């Protein structure tokens, strides 16, 4: 089962639909009392988009700290920003607010989430906060940037299976979004098969 942590965002149920086509999925709010127990039982965690700054989003950052390296983690928009903060990066306000705007994204290095995708592709962006490129994020590769404003759009810690996307794969405006979610789910399923063989 993949657990989606809902950061009180309208896009969360798009994510639930995408993941639910591929595997068992559960969803719980970021401040729900059952969150810790649900996360323990899950095979992987997806942190949804949401409003505001990640430090204000319930138990999200605590959960990332707790389960990093134990379960695959995918952070989307606010979830991406939480990963950045938890692992020592910095956030800043974007030079240009992106609410419902398409951008072309260019891959800068390999990323499991982008398997079977072209080197450039269109994504949908809804955010006013970005990762500060001036502050290093140890153990993470920057795997995609926006071609229009140069902002960081994706990060990956391959060893720990932690992936962050600043854009919205669950939006209809991200044409290859379902492929990205499928790539993550496939990784989760491979982990389960490997552990069953041990």
Curated annotation (Swiss-Prot):
NCBIfam families linked to this entry: trpG_papA (TIGR00566)
GO function terms (MF aspect): anthranilate synthase activity
Highest classification ranks of the organism: Bacteria, Bacillati, Bacillota, Bacilli, Lactobacillales
Enzyme class: lyase
Protein name: Anthranilate synthase component 2
Reaction catalysed by this enzyme: chorismate + L-glutamine = anthranilate + pyruvate + L-glutamate + H(+)
Signal peptide: none
Protein's pathway: Amino-acid biosynthesis; L-tryptophan biosynthesis; L-tryptophan from chorismate: step 1/5
InterPro entries the record matches: Anth_synth/Amidotransfase (IPR050472), Class_I_gatase-like (IPR029062), GATASE (IPR017926), TrpG/PapA_dom (IPR006221)
Entry-linked CDD domains: GATase1_Anthranilate_Synthase
Residue ranges occupied by any Glutamine amidotransferase type-1 domain in the UniProt entry: 1-194
Binding residue positions for L-glutamine: 50-52, 81, 128-129
Subunit structure: Heterotetramer consisting of two non-identical subunits: a beta subunit (TrpG) and a large alpha subunit (TrpE).
């Amino acid at each position: 089962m993949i657990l989606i942590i809902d950061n009180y965002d309208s896009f969360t149920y798009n994510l639930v639909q995408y993941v639910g086509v591929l595997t068992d999925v559960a969803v719980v709010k970021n401040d729900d009392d059952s969150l810790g127990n649900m996360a323990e039982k899950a095979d992987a965690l997806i942190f949804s988009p949401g409003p505001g700054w990640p430090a204000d989003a319930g138990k999200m950052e605590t959960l990332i700290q707790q389960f990093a390296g134990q379960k695959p983690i995918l952070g989307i928009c606010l979830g991406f920003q939480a990963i950045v903060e938890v692992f020592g990066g910095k956030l800043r306000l974007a030079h240009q607010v992106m609410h419902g705007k398409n951008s072309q994204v260019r891959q800068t290095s390999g990323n499991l989430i982008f398997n079977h995708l072209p080197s450039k592709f269109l994504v949908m962006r809804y955010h006013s906060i970005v990762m500060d490129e001036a502050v290093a994020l140890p153990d993470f590769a920057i795997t995609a940037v926006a071609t229009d404003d140069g902002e960081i759009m994706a990060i990956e810690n391959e060893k720990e299976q932690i992936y962050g996307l600043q854009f919205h794969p669950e939006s209809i405006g991200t044409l290859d979004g379902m492929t990205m979610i499928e790539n993550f789910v496939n990784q989760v399923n491979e982990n389960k098969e490997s552990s069953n063989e041990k």
